[in-house]
C-alpha cells in the first residue's frame, strides 16, 4: 500500500524536479541463453567421459549397442562416433548376469592401462553390485577382474554408480551408492579408498550423504580448499530427474547441500528433460536427458565462481537485495518475493542497484529480472553491464507484489561481471536477477 501511495503522490504533484530524466527506451532483445549441446542423439545414459591425448571418450549404461557402449570425439562438443562395446564379453561370469550393466566409470591409470568400474546384476541375490575390469586401450576390450564383485553390501540393497575420485594428494577412491531404494531403506553415498589401479579396496567406507529419497550418480570434485559432491535426485524415468551438489571442507564432512539444485528441467527452460547422471570434467559437464523415450547425451560449459559451479544455460539466481544499493532501499516482508525481500525506491536520478554475476565463458546470456510494477503503465530501468550502457529493461504492468520476469540479452565476459539497474521510466521493485 505504501508503494502505491508514493506513486499516487508523485503523480498528483507532477513536479519535474521530483522525477529523473527517463532512460531512452531500448527494444527488448532476443534471449541469448546457450543451452547444452546434444552430442549423441541416441540412447546414451549415465555418461562417463574423459580426454586423453586430444581425444575424448565417453561411456554409457548398456543399450542396444552393447554392455558398455563407448564413443569418441576430437573435442567435447564432437563430432562423436559410437565405437562399439568397450566390454564385449560382458560383466564377470563368476557373479554377474548380463542385461543390467549400468553407470560405467573409466579411469586412465599412470601405467598406461585403464580401469572400468561398472554396476551389474548379482546372480545370487538379484541385486545390483559393483565390479571392476581392466584394458590396455580406452576403447577396450575391458576384461573383468576376479570372480566376485568389488563392492556388494546386500544388507543395504546392493551397490551402484561407482565413480573414481583422485584427491590432490594422489589418494584414489571410489564414491558409490548403496541401493537402499531397492529395499525400501535410505540410500547413502559412500567413499572407499582403493589400491592397485582401483581394482582392490584399501580401507573402510566413509558415509558422505544419506537420503530417504533418491540420491544417486555421485561425482566428487576437489576445487581449492573444498570438495563438491554432485548427485542426481528425483525419479530418473521422467523430467523430474535433476542434478544437485553438496560442499564440504573435508572428506569427512560436514556436507552442506546447495540451496537450489544446479540443473533441472526448469533451470534449462525445458530444453533438457531430466538432466541427470552428470559427469564433471574440468570446465565441461556431460549429462543425459530424455528425448522420445531415450536418454541422449549433452555437454555444457562449466565455470567455477569462487570454486562453486555455474553451468551455462542453467539459470542462476542472484537476490537483488544482496547487491550494492545507492539511494534506494531493501523492502522486507515482500509478499511472494524470493527470499521475502526486494529492492524498492529506485526512484531518483542517482538510484541504482548493482549485482555481481558469473559467466562460465565470454558471450551472450539471457538476464531475467524478477520484478513487480504497480505504476499503471510500462516502466523501465537503465541497464549497465561492466560500466557500459546496454540499453534498458522494460517492465509491463503487474501490480505491486505480483512478481513476474522481464528478460533481455546481455553480453558478458568470462568470470565475474557487474549488472547495474538504474532509474528509468516510472517505478518498479526488483526481486532478483537470474542469469542463463
Regions found by a protein language model. Give the residues of each.
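Low-complexity, intrinsically disordered short peptide segments enriched in small/polar/basic residues
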Residues: 4, 20, 31, 36-37, ...
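Intrinsically disordered, low-complexity regions enriched in Ser/Pro/Gly/Gln/His and often acidic
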Residues: 10, 14-15, 20, 49, ...
Amino acid at each position: 500500500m505504501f508503494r502505491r501511495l508514493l506513486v499516487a503522490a508523485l503523480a498528483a504533484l507532477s513536479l519535474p524536479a521530483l522525477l529523473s530524466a527517463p532512460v531512452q527506451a531500448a527494444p527488448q532483445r532476443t534471449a541469448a541463453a546457450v543451452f547444452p549441446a546434444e552430442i549423441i542423439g541416441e540412447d546414451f545414459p549415465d555418461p562417463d567421459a574423459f580426454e586423453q591425448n586430444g581425444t575424448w571418450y565417453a561411456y554409457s549404461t548398456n543399450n542396444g549397442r552393447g554392455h558398455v557402449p563407448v564413443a569418441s570425439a576430437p573435442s567435447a562438443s564432437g563430432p562423436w562416433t559410437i565405437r562399439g562395446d568397450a566390454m564385449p564379453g560382458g560383466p564377470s561370469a563368476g557373479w554377474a548376469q548380463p542385461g543390467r550393466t549400468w553407470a560405467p566409470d573409466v579411469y586412465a591409470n599412470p601405467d598406461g592401462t585403464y580401469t572400468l568400474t561398472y554396476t551389474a546384476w548379482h546372480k545370487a541375490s538379484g541385486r545390483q553390485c559393483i565390479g571392476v575390469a581392466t584394458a590396455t586401450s580406452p576403447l577396450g576390450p575391458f576384461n573383468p577382474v576376479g570372480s566376485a564383485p568389488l563392492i556388494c553390501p546386500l544388507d543395504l540393497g546392493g551397490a551402484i554408480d561407482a565413480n573414481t575420485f583422485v584427491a590432490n594428494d594422489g589418494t584414489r577412491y571410489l564414491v558409490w551408492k548403496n541401493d537402499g531404494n531397492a529395499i525400501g531403506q535410505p540410500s547413502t553415498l559412500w567413499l572407499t579408498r582403493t589400491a592397485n589401479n582401483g581394482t582392490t579396496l584399501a580401507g573402510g567406507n566413509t558415509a558422505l550423504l544419506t537420503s530417504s529419497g533418491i540420491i544417486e550418480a555421485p561425482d566428487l570434485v576437489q576445487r581449492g580448499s573444498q570438495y563438491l559432491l554432485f548427485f542426481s535426485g528425483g525419479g530418473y524415468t521422467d523430467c523430474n530427474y535433476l542434478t544437485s551438489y553438496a560442499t564440504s571442507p573435508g572428506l569427512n564432512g560436514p556436507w552442506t547441500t546447495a540451496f537450489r539444485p544446479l540443473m533441472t528441467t526448469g533451470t534449462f527452460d525445458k530444453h533438457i528433460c531430466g538432466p541427470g547422471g552428470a559427469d564433471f570434467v574440468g570446465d565441461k559437464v556431460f549429462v543425459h536427458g530424455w528425448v522420445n523415450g531415450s536418454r541422449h547425451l549433452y555437454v555444457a560449459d562449466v565455470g567455477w565462481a569462487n570454486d562453486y559451479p555455474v553451468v551455462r544455460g542453467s539459470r542462476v539466481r542472484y537476490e537483488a537485495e544482496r547487491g550494492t544499493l545507492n539511494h534506494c532501499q531493501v523492502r522486507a516482508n515482500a509478499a511472494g518475493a524470493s527470499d521475502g525481500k526486494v529492492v524498492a525506491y529506485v526512484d531518483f536520478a542517482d538510484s541504482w542497484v548493482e549485482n555481481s554475476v558469473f559467466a562460465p565463458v565470454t558471450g551472450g546470456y539471457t538476464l531475467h529480472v524478477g520484478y513487480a510494477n504497480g505504476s499503471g503503465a510500462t516502466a523501465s530501468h537503465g541497464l549497465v553491464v561492466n560500466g557500459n550502457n546496454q540499453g534498458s529493461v522494460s517492465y509491463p504492468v503487474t501490480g505491486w507484489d505480483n512478481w513476474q520476469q522481464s528478460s533481455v540479452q546481455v553480453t558478458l565476459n568470462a568470470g565475474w561481471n557487474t549488472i547495474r539497474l538504474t532509474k528509468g521510466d516510472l517505478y518498479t521493485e526488483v526481486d532478483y536477477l537470474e542469469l542463463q
